[in-house]
Amino acid sequence: MFRRIVAVPSSWSSLQLFSTSAVRSSNGLAAILEQVSAKKSAPREAKTPSKYADRKPQHSSPVRKKKVFVRWTTGSEKAREIANTVVSEVLSIRSDGRLRLILPEENRIQELSMQDVARQLDLEVHSLRFIKSETDAGGRPLPLVKRVSVREAFRVHAERMAAEREKELLRKGVSARRVGAKERRAPDSKQVRISWQISPTDFSNQKSKEIRGHLERGHTVLVLLANKDASGPAPQVSPRELQRRSSLLDELAAILEDINCSVVRSGDPASRVELKLVPKAPQEVDRHALKEQRRLQRAEKLKRRLERRGPASAQE
């Protein structure tokens, strides 16, 4: 006798849970389908947790922020130094350089970047002064800066440096009385700008007197000799013009010889020259030498008096 064999599909050949009775019965195919369905619906065993499950997700490297660079094309070295001090304060509060700028002449406040301020500002006329830190509409800090004259910027900087110097001396143990009023009220610096095209008359009657007056009052004077339009590149200078500029510098040096001050010169007559004039403190007089000098003067007077009386007494 031949047995009837039910062919099992190849996809089910790996199943070993089918009973022979289910295959022999007429409803064998339906039973197989039920068993397959039950096999699929059976709950899966929980997988073993991976050893990398507790590993923290790796974050991408932070995006580097672009640094703000400010380049000044006008003004003296001291004026640039003062402006860079304000730039450092702004960048310490707002790394992208955004700020609010007060324009007193125009009676308005403008919000712009530090680079825009540097492009618009002429350090030979104006400078910057840090006021305070505010917040913008999004709650981020926003520095408030005021455009001021160069003279005011020099004055504020001198007062600030004097205050810092006093604090440093006090920190080192020097008493406030020893610091003295001179340290607490350091004289402000004055800036005198002279054009290379100035006439000899204007130089002798105006600029030289202005420089002398500042030095006699104890102020440090910054003298800037440059072209009237110093924003662009320096033009080519002829030998005759160089000689005239050298004569102007010699005349200024002759004026400074009569004044007790130190002179620090930098620059080139072909473009611009900067002079830093610092008045020297008056030398202290030696009291013992002065006393000896007065004693000798009294002795000399007495000797002359006796000489005048000598002939008169002899005649008597």
Swiss-Prot record:
Residues 42-57 have a biased composition (Basic and acidic residues). Residues 40-64, 297-316 are annotated as: Disordered. Residues 1-12 form a transit peptide. GO terms for cellular component: mitochondrion. It holds the Pfam family mIF3. The keyword Transit peptide applies. Keywords: Mitochondrion, Transit peptide. It is found in: Mitochondrion. It comes from the Eukaryota. Coiled coil: none annotated. Belongs to the AIM23 family. This is Altered inheritance of mitochondria protein 23, mitochondrial. The lineage of its organism: Eukaryota, Fungi, Dikarya, Ascomycota, Saccharomycotina.
